[in-house]
Curated annotation (Swiss-Prot):
Name the record gives this protein: Large ribosomal subunit protein uL11
One Pfam assignment: Ribosomal_L11
GO biological process: translation
GO CC terms in record: cytosolic large ribosomal subunit
Gene3D superfamilies referenced in this protein's UniProt entry, alphabetically: Ribosomal protein L11, C-terminal domain, Ribosomal protein L11/L12, N-terminal domain
Source organism of this protein record: Pseudomonas entomophila (strain L48)
An MF annotation (GO) of this entry: large ribosomal subunit rRNA binding
Function, as annotated: Forms part of the ribosomal stalk which helps the ribosome interact with GTP-bound translation factors.
Keyword list, A-Z: Methylation, Ribonucleoprotein, Ribosomal protein, RNA-binding, rRNA-binding
Record's comment on post-translational modification: One or more lysine residues are methylated.
UniProt cross-references to InterPro entries, sorted A to Z: Ribosomal_uL11, Ribosomal_uL11_bac-typ, Ribosomal_uL11_C, Ribosomal_uL11_C_sf, Ribosomal_uL11_CS, Ribosomal_uL11_N, Ribosomal_uL11_N_sf
Protein family: Belongs to the universal ribosomal protein uL11 family.
HAMAP family according to UniProt: Ribosomal_uL11
SUBUNIT field: Part of the ribosomal stalk of the 50S ribosomal subunit. Interacts with L10 and the large rRNA to form the base of the stalk. L10 forms an elongated spine to which L12 dimers bind in a sequential fashion forming a multimeric L10(L12)X complex.
């Protein structure tokens, strides 16, 4: 018989830096999950990623207090800000442009995100990432 699902918890945790402090501790603690077990497993799974990049994670908590989790790729906005060398996007993206990204940078980001995107091919994924860049106030070259 399959385990009964008690809750889904969605968090963004920095790769390789999960610890019991907020937001991880309180979110897992209220469902009775072993926090240190999650932190060790998460840090082990994200070991190959660049440390400090936020990594979305979906934790499935079962009624017997066990859990499984699935990590996603880093959000496109974080990767775009890193590619453009920015700390934040534009407050008024339609009028104030704060940086520029090239098609090559967009392709690199699209390849990293392709598993989490609904795009049929790489070109569609690049267009999706380019739209995100424009909505952040970045100029897009070559698309």
């Amino acid at each position: 018989m399959a385990k009964k699902i008690q809750a889904y918890i969605k968090l963004q945790v920095k790769a390789g830096q999960a610890n019991p402090s907020p937001p991880v501790g309180p979110a897992l603690g209220q469902h009775g999950v072993n926090i240190m077990e999650f932190c060790k497993a998460f840090n082990a799974r994200t070991q190959g990623q660049e440390p400090g990049l936020p990594t979305p994670v979906i934790i499935t908590v079962y009624s017997d207090r066990s859990f499984t989790f699935e990590t996603k790729s880093t959000p496109a906005s974080v990767l775009l800000k890193k590619a453009a060398g920015l700390t934040s996007g534009s407050a008024r993206p339609n009028t104030v442009k704060v940086g520029t990204v090239t098609r090559a940078q967009l392709e690199d980001i699209a390849k990293a995100k392709q598993a989490d995107l609904t795009a049929a091919d790489l070109d569609a994924a690049v267009r999706t990432i380019a739209g995100s860049a424009r909505s952040m106030g970045l100029n897009v070259e070559g698309v």
